[in-house]
Amino acid sequence: AGGRAATARALAALGVSSDGLVQVDGSGLSRDNRISARQLSALVHAVLASGGESAALWRGSLALAGQTGTLEKRLVGTPSAGRVRAKTGFIGGTSSLSGIATSLDGRERVFAILVNYPDVDGLNNSCWKPMQDEIVRFLVERLP
């Protein structure tokens, strides 16, 4: 209960609504946790807008497409490589990618892509990565 209250206070301090947020555990591993893409994007934006050392440390902790962490093998050989910093997420039936995409003209765009899918044969996290990558490439390479 203390963790949920602390999360609600932190979100409120950043100006992010906690309406509809369901936090069952602090690790994010419960299938019953819930956050909307809008809330997640608002959180990313608020952390970046807060500036200072915390924002810089958080940004630096995110994987860099085509170079580091869970994004090391994604977007390789595309103009988007090195322009996307993001956090991946996966738990059975859910695949997510959220973070910051820097367009070719230098504009930063915050995004959150959350996919829920049925637990049936043949569907797994790797089915959704190409779609997530295409959305991010659109943000970097083609969105005016």
Q: What are the roles of these predicted feature ranges?
A:
Residues K73-D105, L114:
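Short, Gly/Ser/Thr-enriched beta-strand-loop segments that form substrate-interacting elements
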Residues V24-G26, S61-G66, T88, I113-Y117:
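Active-site-proximal beta-strand/loop segments in catalytic clefts of secreted hydrolases
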Residues L11, S18, L57-R59, P79-A81, ...:
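Active-site lining segments that contact anionic ligands and/or coordinate catalytic metals
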